Amino acid sequence: MAKEGVEKAEETEQMIEKETSKEPAEGGDGSHRLGDAQEMRAVVLAGFGGLNKLRLSRKAMPEPQDGELKIRVKACGLNFIDLMVRQGNIDNPPKTPLVPGFECSGIVEALGDSVKGYEIGDRVMAFVNYNAWAEVVCTPVEFVYKIPDDMSFSEAAAFPMNFVTAYTMLFEIANLREGMSVLVHSAGGGVGQAVAQLCSTVPNVTVFGTASTFKHEAIKDSVTHLFDRNADYVQEVKRISAEGVDIVLDCLCGDNTGKGLSLLKPLGTYILYGSSNMVTGETKSFFSFAKSWWQVEKVNPIKLYEENKVIAGFSLLNLLFKQGRSGLIRGVVEKLIGLYNQKKIKPVVDSLWALEEVKEAMQRIHDRGNIGKLILDVEKTPTPLMANDSTETSEAGEEEEDHEGDSENKERMPFIQ
């Protein structure tokens, strides 16, 4: 049965590969047609695993259902959660093949029935429950927001996930106020830079940040105190602030959970919003997963009570797509747009990548090499060395498997029934 399952998976991937190689005729509007169906380019994840599971393909163009908007995509945001989705390193992963991506920006091209408040031609940004990495998306109107005239599509694609996450944690959960202090990990990333900018809108807020040393020169002016992510930041923080900090924002998990809780002042709030420590190699590692959770300090509610500390979690995607809080998020977006119009915040874009360059872009995220947000620019022409339609084939015509995991320290785990 296992062999049969593998053969079926390989057959599916070969079918997708064949679809990728087809060159349909181009329509007058820039779209493509196969037969009578309009088609579009999209990044497809053929199965969970390494970068070799990604390729550029052609898919049928979606049309808006009741309450949806059809958006001609100009730019898409890349997030660390996309890397975890590719690996299948999330709870209840969807079935593959799928089109990844949760946020994009573009122009409204069509309106579904009952849609009000938007017109064809509006410039917008949007959350999408997958399917964002494509030339066209359809998404419910409650997840779509108009963007200012002076906001570029690249900035708009860098805006929703990062700034909404940062704002909700700081102001809706932790109640950031004047004179407080914040510790944020991955200070050079998209959320980290959004946190730093939002903290600057409140008087006398001290921001402690951790980041790789090569990022320090570029981001040193955005935070008050900056530490090497591999150093003993607990002692460094306590040397500056003996009591600790008011807010800890943790996207790492693992042993950083216990460290973060130990740094909280009385009435302080620790918020976990990611678990990037679970990602080491190119594919999902059961060893890294087990190690990260094993290192998480077991939280004793009585201890929280005695020390007057608060521990919380935040998942923006769950809040939007599973818990129905789109109204709350729309209010947050409106406040953020106001801050943008006042020139108090501005998305930091690390780099732009063509759809064909998605593998290289994801590798940059995996290497933690970005400062700010990586963007897929749908209209960008790929560099010649990367213009391989995001596929790799061997001489036999089969996909070449990438080397998986940490080459210097590849741990092997026994099969668990």
From Swiss-Prot:
Region called Disordered, residue ranges: 1-33, 382-417
PROSITE patterns, per database record: QOR_ZETA_CRYSTAL
UniProt modified residues of type Phosphoserine: S390, S394
Modified residues (Phosphothreonine): T391, T393
Family the entry assigns: Belongs to the zinc-containing alcohol dehydrogenase family. Quinone oxidoreductase subfamily.
Family annotation (SMART domains): PKS_ER
Biased composition (Acidic residues): 395-405
GO terms of molecular function: oxidoreductase activity; zinc ion binding
E.C. number(s) listed in UniProt: 1.-.-.-
Organism in which the protein naturally occurs: Mus musculus (Mouse)
InterPro entries cross-referenced by the UniProt entry: ADH-like_N, GroES-like_sf, NAD(P)-bd_dom_sf, PKS_ER, Quin_OxRdtase/zeta-crystal_CS, SV-ATPase_mito-regulator
Keywords: Oxidoreductase, Phosphoprotein
One Pfam family per UniProt: ADH_N
Biased composition (Basic and acidic residues): 406-417
Official protein name in the record: Synaptic vesicle membrane protein VAT-1 homolog-like
